[in-house]
Amino acid sequence: MFGFSLFGKNLLNIWAILLGVYIYAHYHKMHLSRYVYIGFYGTSLSPIITQIMYITDLPYLLRLFISLAVGLMIGFVLPPLSTHVHYAHKGYSLYNVGFSAGIIATVVVSVLKSFGITTESRLIWSEGNNQLLFAVLCCLFVAMIIAAFLFGGKEVGTSYRKILSCSGIGGTDYLRDNGGAATVLNMAINGLFATIFVLGVGGELNGPTLGGIFTIIGFSATGKHIRNIAPIMFGVLFASFTKHWTISSPSPILALLFSTTLAPIAGEFGIFVGLLAGFLHSSVALNVGIVYGGMNLYNNGFAGGIVAIFMVPVIHSIRDRRARAKGEISL
């Protein structure tokens, strides 16, 4: 929520989706806390609400009614769909709701297009802020590191090493398993690494890239650490040497940051597979967005889900074949 408030989300376009999730929880007589995280991630579809409000051919009250109705429906269908698609990639894509949001966005945008309503994307990309924002971010990360050692004491290093040993598959909770101090340290290290990586490849620090960096920081409490995000990011970087785009361009630099949704693949299967996942993700992420015209802010969550569903069964089949071969059992 915080990161994407820098590009795409605001106080007006998120509430209908959140209310839809609340209605779903109330309908099933479940506590809202069970679905609140889906509601937060589901606000990735908030541009749809804004887009409907800008259909100038319709009266204002009708636009307001339609946007609220669509937002409520999106929020209502998100929980069951997100639960269902999780079984497809088995937690190897951390942005699970981004995958389900991509499916919903595809359906909604297709319906809008069938009524002659089209969406036009535009690029607003700020430049020249690197020195100021880098200084601010460095101060933040240094403060987090100091706070981690100040409140965590000598055990921070041990707990952090335990984090580094985790694969990071969806559902991991570093705060619960390793404590707040080690988690804050992990967040600071990942944030600093991502920031330096962006600047190192010639990228710009602005709203979208800060959103990507803060997303990495946020998910450093649940799945990401430097050992499993680095291979994915380097995979995207290596892809830029062979493909027809430059890594510092807006879409590729965002794909670089958000590709870390596939961190569990590198954490579970190793560096080489992580590099391959990043390589594939860069291609998928830069091409699937055309389906829903940018209406899903978590485009890389959708792309990451596709890559995970493609790669994980193949990797498991190879592993099973090797295991059977060692046991002298044929497939």
What is each of the regions a protein language model found here?
Residues 1-84, 197-282, 287:
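Early transmembrane hairpin of solute transport permeases
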Residues 32-37, 91-101, 170-185, 294-303:
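Juxtamembrane helix-loop boundaries in multi-pass membrane proteins
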Residues 46-134, 288-293, 297-299:
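Membrane-interface helix-loop-helix junctions at boundaries between adjacent transmembrane segments
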Residues 98, 128-129, 162-168, 321-331:
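Short, highly charged, low-complexity non-transmembrane loops/tails of multi-pass membrane proteins
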Residues 101-110, 138-146, 260, 303-315:
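Hydrophobic cores of alpha-helical transmembrane segments in multi-pass inner/ER membrane proteins
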Residues 119-213:
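Membrane-embedded hairpin module used as a gating/binding unit in multi-pass transport
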Residues 149-160, 314-329:
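Membrane-interface capping segments at transmembrane-helix boundaries
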Residues 276-316:
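Internal helix-turn-beta structural module
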